[in-house]
Amino acid sequence: MPYKVPEIYYRFEPQTFYITSPARASNLQLINHNNILVKAGQVTIVSTGIIFPKETSFAFILYGKSAKSIFCHTGLIDPGFQGELKLIVLNKTEDDITLFENDLRVSVTAFVYGVPKLHDYSDLCPPRYSKDAGFDLYLPTDVTVKPRVPNRYSVNICCPAQLKSYKPVLFGRSGLAAKGLTIKVSRWQNQLQIIFYNYTKSQITYTARTRIAQVVFMHKKHLPTTLTRLKPTMHLSENIKYSWARVSFQDIKTFPVQDEKLYSSSKDTSDSQMSRGDAGLGSSGLM
């Protein structure tokens, strides 16, 4: 039988962006049509207008880029998140920056993830909500992050969970990014290495046991190590090439579906875990 491309339905309310990707694309692309002011020393949270009303088996990556001197937090979006996707934008300079029409490009892509069983809870915490993709990573020691420079933190800790064919990848927490602290997307290999960037004007100290990052176990097919000409790719950081899943993003206004197929049943959520719903910014919330 021919492969059936998974369908992912979304709602779109055009406010700041319009969609540039074709119907049924596997990379949902947007570009701004309204000006966006990104103030110096402040965090700007931009609504994309995209909502996934149904839980899926895929996790998502929200990625933004611009030729202007800004940084967009790479967002890990959990399958159970049903709120509006919002992009966290930070200013690299000491002056306000205006993103004019077509200055900010955003993409939403899907990937396959795994949830391994933990045998050691000292560094990782299992997902908090039903259908969460990310594990919370605790800081093993105190760390001080200086403003406006890369801060490298390394500790000789191997990932306490292993899953065949899946690789642990670190993402920054949206809650901390919303306060000005970002983390470079990176692989957790022989040792834990985190590169922080503090976009505030003050030094920040985080104590041991702070939930500092998200770790997601991404299928290795999304992390090609050789040249791939047949699959489109993008860089989540200079050392991480990412190839997204082949899915079909469909606007429910264009491809209407029956309500029972669109909305998740309460039976999908286990008794021991809550459903995320629209809490937070897609993964780690705002706390």
UniProtKB/Swiss-Prot annotation:
Q: Which Pfam families match?
A: dUTPase (PF00692)
UniProt keyword list = Hydrolase, Magnesium, Metal-binding, Nucleotide metabolism
Which segments carry the region annotation Disordered?
264-287
Question: Compositional bias (Low complexity) spans?
Answer: 264-275
Quote the InterPro entries the UniProt record gives. dUTPase-like, dUTPase-like_sf, HSV_DUT
Q: Does the keyword Protein transport apply?
A: no
Q: What's the catalysed reaction? A: dUTP + H2O = dUMP + diphosphate + H(+)
Metal-binding keyword on record: yes
Under the heading Gene3D superfamilies, the entry gives: 2.70.40.10
Query: One biological process GO term for this chain?
Result: dUTP metabolic process
* Cofactor(s) annotated in UniProt: Mg(2+)
- Residues annotated for substrate binding in this entry: 173-175
Briefly, what is this protein's role? Answer: Involved in nucleotide metabolism: produces dUMP, the immediate precursor of thymidine nucleotides and decreases the intracellular concentration of dUTP to avoid uracil incorporation into viral DNA.
Give the record's family classification: Belongs to the dUTPase family.
Which protein are we looking at? Deoxyuridine 5'-triphosphate nucleotidohydrolase
Which species expresses this protein natively?
Answer: Saimiriine herpesvirus 2 (strain 11)
